[in-house]
């Protein structure tokens, strides 16, 4: 599965210039970088929420799942929200148990806390199998316990489906825990890409080294 080269320009200024890459099935790709580096713009373009300057981004797949930073909840029960993305009730029950929301399955989803809404949105996405999945800061509203629980479920979903998963994260520790490959964005450009051991511990670009030193990896 390939991502074709693309760029994004706002008011005459290029905010993202991506050279393209090949995604391997069954791998987790963590996107790291400072605020404003282009991480979320990258995810939104791949998800089709934003348009790139060029036509088309993904090659060889139209099966893409996306969880944005801001999650939506319809005015119905938590379980009913989850079943909007698939009617397999046994799977919904298993996911509710796995993410710790079973006791809230009948609560109106628009009354959940931020962390609960994020967990609901994550398992709602997991009701379907996709070739590629984009998660934009999926655990930002969660505490450490539910973050680790969600990371375990994400890794399990990738193993189960064989999808390629792109994870935008502000947490270098999260990238270290569950990523296979890491992409470092700097001022709208992909500055470093490779196995997490190389990017996080033996980076080549001085900007990457400075970023990692600042955030304590």
Question: Could you say what each language-model-derived stretch is?
Answer:
Residues 197-217:
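C-terminal boundary and immediately downstream tail of ABC-type ATPase nucleotide-binding domains
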Residues 169-170:
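H-loop/switch region of ABC-family ATPase nucleotide-binding domains
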Residues 71-84:
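Conserved catalytic motifs of ABC-family nucleotide-binding domains
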Residues 89-104:
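Conserved ABC ATPase "signature" region
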Residues 133-136:
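Catalytic Walker B motif of ABC-type/P-loop ATPase nucleotide-binding domains
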Residues 108-112, 116:
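Conserved ABC ATPase signature
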